[in-house]
Structure formats: structure tokens, C-alpha cells
């Protein structure tokens, strides 16, 4: 059976924050304007949190939005490369890092 948890880093983070604040999934689903089953899948890493939800989460939990966005993007990179062989994953990440460093905004 294929593992459907591809957005796990961000999902774990939002679950940990929710539990630390003693909130229920229902409350978060309402805040993010989604239903509870979808929110549950986000925490499990089976569904991706939408980008527009990140500022709401940062405000609710009083955390740095940039840090949440970084984690969210890292999950996207991981999801894109997850099915590739390990050496190819690492080479692709290294090449992308080089490209970002060399990019002059053109």
C-alpha cells in the first residue's frame, strides 16, 4: 500500500501547535474555512495546506510566518522528489540551491 503522507513536516507542525494550544480540529477547520476531514488529512500529511492558510495559522499561534512558509515549501520540494532515488533527490536539491544562489532575478 502506497504511503499517502507526503506533506508530513508541515502536518506534524500544525498538529503539534494545535495540541500545545489545546484546540480541537473542528476549531482549526472553521478558522481555515475547510471541513474537519480535510483538516485532519492536512495534519496527517495526506493533503497540502493551502498557501493562503499560512498567515492565519501564524497569527493564531503567534509564530513567525516566514518559518511556517519555509517549512511549507520544504514539504513541497520533498513531495516533488519523494519517489525518486536517493542520489537523484540529493543531486536535484544541490543543483537547485546552486541555481538559487546564482539567480540575479532575471
Predicted regions and their residues:
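Flexible coil/turn residues that form the inter-helical turn or adjacent wing/linker of helix-turn-helix
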Residues: 10, 21, 35, 50
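Short alpha-helical DNA-recognition segment
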Residues: 22-41, 60
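A short, Lys/Arg-rich alpha-helix, primarily the initiator
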Residues: 1-20
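Residues in the recognition helix of alpha-helical DNA-binding motifs
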Residues: 17, 31, 42, 71
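Residues within the helices of the helix-turn-helix
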Residues: 15, 26, 55
Amino acid at each position: 500500500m502506497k504511503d499517502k503522507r507526503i506533506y508530513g513536516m508541515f502536518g506534524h507542525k500544525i498538529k503539534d501547535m494545535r495540541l500545545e494550544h489545546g484546540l480541537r480540529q473542528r476549531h482549526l477547520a472553521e478558522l481555515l474555512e475547510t471541513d474537519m476531514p480535510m483538516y485532519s488529512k492536512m495534519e496527517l500529511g495526506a493533503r497540502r495546506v493551502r498557501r493562503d492558510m499560512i498567515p492565519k495559522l501564524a497569527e493564531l499561534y503567534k509564530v513567525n510566518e516566514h518559518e511556517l512558509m519555509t517549512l511549507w515549501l520544504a514539504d513541497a520540494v520533498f513531495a516533488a522528489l519523494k519517489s525518486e532515488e536517493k542520489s537523484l533527490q540529493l543531486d536535484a536539491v544541490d543543483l537547485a540551491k546552486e541555481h538559487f544562489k546564482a539567480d540575479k532575478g532575471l
